[in-house]
Amino acid sequence: MYDDIFNWLKEHGITEVECILPDITGVARGKIIPKDKFISEPDMRLPEAVLLQTVTGEYPQSSLLDETDADMELKPDQSTLRFVPWAQDPTASLIFDCFSPDGLPVETAPRNVLKRILKLYENMGLEPIVAPEMEFYLISPNPDPDVPLQPPIGRTGRSEFGRRSYAVDAVNEFDPLFEEIYDYCHEQNLEVDTLIHEIGAAQMEINFLHGNALDLADQVFLFKRTVRESAFHHKMYATFMAKPMEGEPGSAMHIHQSLNNVENGNNAFSSDDGTPSELFFHFIGGLQKYLPQTMPFFAPYVNSFRRLTRFTAAPTNVEWGYDNRTVGLRVPRAKAKGRRIENRLAGVDVNPYLAIACSLACGYLGIKEQLQPRAPLSSNAYSLPYQFPTTLEESIERLRQCEPIHEILGQRFVEMYIAVKEQEVSEYFRVISPWERKYLLLHV
């Protein structure tokens, strides 16, 4: 069954295998196993609770958790076999899928959530195509979380200051790092494309080539590890926080999405005459209706909401428009075969499997409900009222009330996701911030 994997490991002289799976926050969990042991026992077991840790490593207080902490059956996906280029010894990585002892997919596994949505589209004769854009900051090493972050020192010996958007020389400040990142990505078959300098100090963006939604989610999952590891090697940090620094723009994961007709390979967002199809408009209608109700998948942490402010290239609404970067749903200029919708809501701190799954789920509901979008906006959308929940707590409550999303993503999964988010909010509010000590200690 796994002969191709075993042969690849032997041919490449692999000594260790990283057996990994994404948890509900997008962290890589799993085991590192000697190659010979992996070949003798390629399947693996881990408790489901591994998937359900908060970002701090705690567990939610939920009756939905298995009291016996029973194991899942884990099976490697051969298509995810890759070389780990930064490892000291020859190492491979494999992403595993999660099954219950009776062989059914574990509904709380993020990869299975995305597969569930892709199956719905498959039943309609459609294949979702996505292309994520990943923004992130480079920062100087900072082991003390109470100290504000600073940009790293580049080749000129200076920290970046001011605004350097699209400046090629500003990217070249860190040329050895980016050469290594691209080399690492190439060795892992991560199909990265354009590199640009974003608005913030040492804020960068790397785009992916478009492709299958599950494959791209896997690539983003591995890309985050890759960039962080390369940054460590060059004595700096790379952060995928949505809003890491005060006074600087936040970082997003924009999701370009379209639907291909499986039968003929054509873009289902375009009619035969090249005009936008009804499916295209229904998809936008679904995003407009359901994105505000599913914010925890696109802004999963308290910090995420600091990004969603006016005039910072982040959306404050779910209006749509042609080539309009002030709206939440932008339709880039493209020929009929390249027609797509850019969901600009997601922060780069999201779990890529869940953000892509939920974005596609919202569009799917729009198609099923035959929803029509509001008229496209050609003016500045920042002048419009804020259309999202303003806090994580409010967004959790709106998700709790959204039954169509519970049904399409899986009732138990959504309830467990809410439990994890509520636990994280509780943990956050136990921490007294420097702002509180500064202004309240002696003034109230």
Feature annotation, model-predicted:
Residues 1-194, 216, 355, 384-444:
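ATP/Mg2+-dependent ligation/transfer catalytic cores
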Residues 2-12, 22-27, 41, 49-51, ...:
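C-terminal accessory/tail domains of diverse enzymes
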Residues 94-100, 204-210, 257:
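Short, hydrophobic beta-strand segments
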Residues 134, 198-206:
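Short, conserved phosphate-binding/catalytic loop or strand-edge motifs used
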Residues 147-156, 253-261, 318-320, 327-333:
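Short beta-strand elements
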Residues 165, 170-174, 178-192, 206-213, ...:
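Accessory "access/gating" subregions that flank catalytic or transport cores
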Residues 242-247:
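Short, solvent-exposed loop/turn elements at beta->coil junctions and helix N-caps
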Residues 251-273:
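Acidic/histidine-rich catalytic neighborhood
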